[in-house]
A protein has these predicted regions:
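Terminal substrate-recognition subdomain of acyl/acetyltransferases
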Residues: 1-12, 105-106
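A short beta-loop-alpha structural element at the N-terminal edge
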Residues: 13-26
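Residue-level recognition of the GNAT/N-acetyltransferase active site
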Residues: 20, 84, 88
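Active-site rim helix/loop that mediates acceptor-substrate recognition in acyltransferases
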Residues: 34-68
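Conserved beta-strand in the GNAT
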Residues: 62-70, 75-82
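A short, glycine- and basic residue-enriched loop/turn
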Residues: 70, 75, 89-90, 111-113
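Conserved acetyl-CoA-binding loop-helix of GNAT-fold acetyltransferases
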Residues: 89-106
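Conserved GNAT acetyl-CoA-binding A-motif
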Residues: 104-114
């Protein structure tokens, strides 16, 4: 993970960008820090491979979190959303969720499940 201090990114805008293979090690570290039963690296790589909507919340070059969604059959499934502890409480998860829901709607999905 980056050594960017929280004070340096306090007011930095969040960019919701595509997740890439190179992001997976950091994503796995965020996942392991947040959950008692985290997803494996293989699960994240499979999500990328099959074309799920996989996005990263990037704050000034620091990966703050991520969101993953599958879409199809008229519905969207938000499978995972996680924000690193030091970035929580600043609305980043909301921005990830809004992005995912907008993407689902643009793809013609009528229902979303979390």
């Amino acid at each position: 993970m980056s050594s960017v201090k929280q004070e340096e990114v306090q007011f930095a805008p969040v960019e919701i960008r595509p997740m890439h293979d190179l992001d997976v090690p950091v994503i796995v570290a965020i996942e392991r820090a947040a959950y008692q039963f985290p997803w494996s690296e293989g699960i994240f790589r499979d999500c990328l491979r099959v074309g799920y909507v996989c996005r990263v919340a990037d704050v000034g070059g620091d990966m703050a979190g991520y969101g993953i969604m599958s879409i199809g059959a008229g519905e969207a499934h938000i499978l995972n959303v996680c924000i690193r502890d030091e970035h929580r409480g600043r609305g980043f998860a909301r921005k990830v969720l809004v992005y995912l829901l907008e993407r689902a709607r643009a793809s013609g999905m009528y229902e979303a499940f979390l």
